[in-house]
C-alpha cells in the first residue's frame, strides 16, 4: 500500500471520494508485479490528475488490527511518500469526485486513525531535515568567525563558507547557486538580487564590518541564515556589548531588538502585509532605514524559488499558513555607509513562534 502526502504551491492536496463527505490523501494498493514507488506515482496521477510532480519516499509504516481494508488484522506495511505537484490535468479517472487544495489540514478525515498520524510523521521528519540544514548554516558562521582576519579577500571568505557548507551536509545552494553572499565595509549597505551578485575584490581591514548571508540546501530543503560580523583591532568581536565602534554596536543592537519585537508582535493570524507595515514603521521610529532592494523583510521557505511569498505590502497571506518563513531586516542609519543584517528561519509550533 502507498499513501502520498502532497502539496501544490504551498497548499495541501486532498481528495474527496464520490460516495463520501470526507477527505483523504491519495493512495492505494500495489498491483501484481508493481514497484511500490510506481504504485505511489500511479495512484497520485489517478486520484489527483497530477501530470507534473516530484515524488519521494518518506518512510515505511505498519498497521495492525482489523480495519476496512484488512479483515485478518495481521500487520500490514505501507510506503509513505511526499509529492510536490506542479501541474494538474484537471481530469480524474477514478472513484474520486474532486481534488481540493487546502491551507489547513481537514477535520473530517476518511481515515482518521491513520492518515493524520502519517502527516504528523511527515511533518516531524521534515522539521528534522530543515533543522539539520539550518544548523549547517549556523555552524558555518561559527566556523568563519574563527577564520576571518585582516588581509583576507571577500572571495576567499565566500569560498571557505561554501566549502564548509558542503562538508557539513549541503549538496547545493538554492539562491542562484551562491552559497555565501559576502559584503564588507561600505558595501554592507548594498542590496542586490542574487542573480546580479558578484563578490568584490575587497580585503578585510583591521577594523571592519562584514555581512554574510548563507543559502545551503540538501535536496530541496533550504537553509537561510545571515549574520553581521565585526572585526576590531584585527579580531572578531563576538559579544555585541564589547564592540567599541558605537555606530556598529547600535546597528547590531537594533537587529536584536527587531527579532525580539517579532516574537512580541506576531501570531499565526498576522498577515505578511501586517508584519511588513509594522516592522518598517518600527525601523523608522528607531532611526533606521530598510535597505532591501525590494523593500521586503523576509519570505516563505519553499522548495522552488518562484513559489516564495514575501513580507511585503498587499500580501494578505497569514504567517501561520506557511510552514516556515525568514525574518531578515537589512538596515542602516540614515546617510550611513554601513549596513546590518540578521536572518533566522521561524515557524509556529502550535500557537508559539519558534526559531528553527
Q: Which sequence ranges carry the predicted segments?
A:
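Conserved Nudix-box catalytic region and its N-terminal flanking loop in Nudix hydrolases
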Residues: 7-46
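Short loop segments at secondary-structure junctions
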Residues: 9-11, 84-89, 104-105, 233-235, ...
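Short, charged/polar surface micro-motifs in flexible loops or helix N-caps
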Residues: 9-12, 20-22, 86-88, 185-190
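"Short basic amphipathic alpha-helical interaction patches in structured regions
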Residues: 28, 95-97, 225-230
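Active-site neighborhoods and metal-handling regions in enzymes and metal-associated proteins
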Residues: 125-356
Amino acid at each position: 500500500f502507498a499513501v502520498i502526502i502532497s502539496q501544490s504551491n504551498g497548499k495541501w492536496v486532498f481528495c474527496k471520494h464520490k460516495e463520501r463527505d470526507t477527505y483523504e490523501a491519495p493512495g492505494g494498493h500495489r498491483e501484481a508485479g508493481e514497484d511500490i514507488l510506481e504504485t505511489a506515482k500511479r495512484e497520485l496521477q489517478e486520484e489527483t490528475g497530477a501530470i507534473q510532480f516530484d515524488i519521494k519516499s518518506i518512510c515505511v509504516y505498519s498497521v495492525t488490527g482489523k480495519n476496512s481494508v484488512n479483515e485478518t488484522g495481521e500487520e500490514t506495511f505501507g510506503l509513505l511518500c511526499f509529492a510536490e505537484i506542479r501541474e494538474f490535468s484537471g481530469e480524474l479517472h477514478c472513484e474520486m469526485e474532486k481534488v481540493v487544495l487546502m491551507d489547513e489540514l481537514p477535520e473530517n478525515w476518511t481515515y482518521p486513525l491513520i492518515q493524520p498520524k502519517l502527516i504528523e510523521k511527515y511533518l516531524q521528519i521534515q522539521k528534522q531535515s530543515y533543522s539539520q540544514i539550518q544548523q549547517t548554516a549556523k555552524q558555518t558562521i561559527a566556523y568563519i568567525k574563527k577564520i576571518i582576519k585582516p588581509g583576507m579577500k571577500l572571495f576567499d571568505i565566500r569560498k571557505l563558507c561554501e566549502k564548509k557548507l558542503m562538508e557539513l551536509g549541503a549538496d547545493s545552494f538554492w539562491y542562484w547557486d551562491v552559497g555565501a553572499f559576502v559584503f564588507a565595509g561600505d558595501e554592507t549597505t548594498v542590496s542586490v538580487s542574487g542573480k546580479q551578485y558578484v563578490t568584490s575584490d575587497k580585503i578585510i581591514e583591521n577594523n571592519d564590518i562584514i555581512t554574510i548571508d548563507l543559502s545551503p540546501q540538501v535536496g530541496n530543503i533550504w537553509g537561510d541564515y545571515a549574520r553581521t560580523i565585526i572585526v576590531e583591532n584585527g579580531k572578531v568581536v563576538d559579544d555585541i556589548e564589547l564592540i567599541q565602534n558605537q555606530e556598529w554596536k547600535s546597528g547590531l543592537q537594533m537587529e536584536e531588538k527587531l527579532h525580539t519585537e517579532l516574537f512580541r508582535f506576531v501570531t499565526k493570524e498576522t498577515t505578511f502585509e501586517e508584519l511588513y507595515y509594522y516592522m518598517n514603521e518600527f525601523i523608522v521610529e528607531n532611526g533606521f532605514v530598510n535597505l532591501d532592494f525590494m523593500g521586503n523583510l523576509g519570505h516563505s521557505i519553499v522548495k522552488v524559488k518562484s513559489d516564495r511569498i514575501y513580507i511585503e505590502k498587499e500580501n494578505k497571506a497569514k504567517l501561520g499558513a506557511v510552514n516556515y518563513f525568514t525574518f531578515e531586516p537589512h538596515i542602516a542609519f540614515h546617510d550611513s555607509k554601513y549596513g546590518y543584517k540578521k536572518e533566522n528561519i521561524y515557524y509556529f509550533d502550535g500557537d508559539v513562534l519558534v526559531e528553527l
